[in-house]
Regions:
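Bacterial N-terminal signal peptides that target proteins for export
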Residues: 1-9
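Active-site loop->helix "elbow" adjoining a glycine-rich segment at hydrolase catalytic centers
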Residues: 134, 199-203, 231-234
């Protein structure tokens, strides 16, 4: 069955997302906002750095490495780390087909996300915006850059965070045959993923669960989360909008350029 995108639906998604940045920030979230560049999380402490008017935390694991018996499985909780994790560089990109983008080194251990939050830490919780990159669900990563010295990061959340007073999250997810490979041999084996071919979408949902559990420590409001994306990331936003399993993990959505269609 094909669901055709309605222009009114697309417009509504954009309007709802725009309202998210203006939402009330006064509601307490029950977790104390942490100051400085070291944040204590349930899985361990992380140390970021101040960049411009933001505190930036890069390469935070939000799921266990999807390797070995976890390949083509639903993402599992991250393995706690001892000590303090240096969160100052992007994690590896997920394995993918070649593209014209500059991409970090690839590794199956790629389920990491990044957080930008205004510096100094806010006095009250801020709206949260979670970004899904494009690339046809076949290439791309949060650390992509314009190659040949022609520019910097493509998905840098710093300016959005410091200029619009929001907490920005960007996340990797599995791509291509490791993230969207539908095969009868893979269906039904994983109770958390009974249908094969949705691992990349499940990674995005796991990132949203991480945000719900952890973003308050960064000054974000887990009850005011907007998801947004472009191209394939935009289409993925539409999937989460209509998926009952993603309900409650976000509150607004912005679909930028990717069609809200499915078969």
């Amino acid at each position: 069955m094909r669901l055709r995108r309605s222009p009114l639906v697309a417009l509504a998604l954009v309007v709802l997302g725009s309202l998210g940045a203006c939402a009330d920030r006064s509601d307490p979230v029950g977790v104390q906002i942490q100051q400085g560049t070291v944040i204590a999380l349930a899985d361990g402490a992380i140390e970021g750095e101040v960049v411009g008017g933001t505190r930036r935390f890069l390469g935070i694991p939000f799921a266990a490495p999807p390797v070995g018996p976890l390949r083509w499985r639903a993402p599992q909780p991250p393995v706690p780390w001892g000590g303090t994790l240096a969160a100052k560089s992007f994690g590896s990109a997920c394995p993918q087909r070649p593209s014209t983008l500059g991409t970090p080194s690839e590794n199956e251990d790629c389920l990491h996300l990044n957080v930008w939050t205004p510096d100094p830490a806010p006095a009250a919780p801020l709206p949260v915006m979670v970004w899904f990159h494009g690339g046809g669900n076949e290439f791309g990563s949060t650390g992509d850059f314009i190659p040949l010295g022609l520019g910097g990061l493509i998905f840098d959340g710093r300016l959005l965070s410091e200029r619009r007073d929001v907490v920005v999250v960007t996340t990797n997810y599995r791509l291509g045959k490791l993230g969207f490979f539908a095969h009868a041999a893979l269906a039904g084996e994983d109770p958390d993923a009974p249908y094969a071919g949705n691992q990349g979408l499940l990674d995005q949902r796991a990132a949203l669960r991480w945000v719900k559990s952890n973003i308050a420590a960064f000054g974000g409001d887990p009850d005011n989360v907007t998801i947004f994306g472009e191209s394939a990331g935009s289409a993925d936003v539409c999937v989460h909008v209509v998926s009952p399993a993603s309900r409650g993990l976000f509150h607004r959505a912005i679909s930028e350029s990717g069609g809200c269609t499915t078969r």
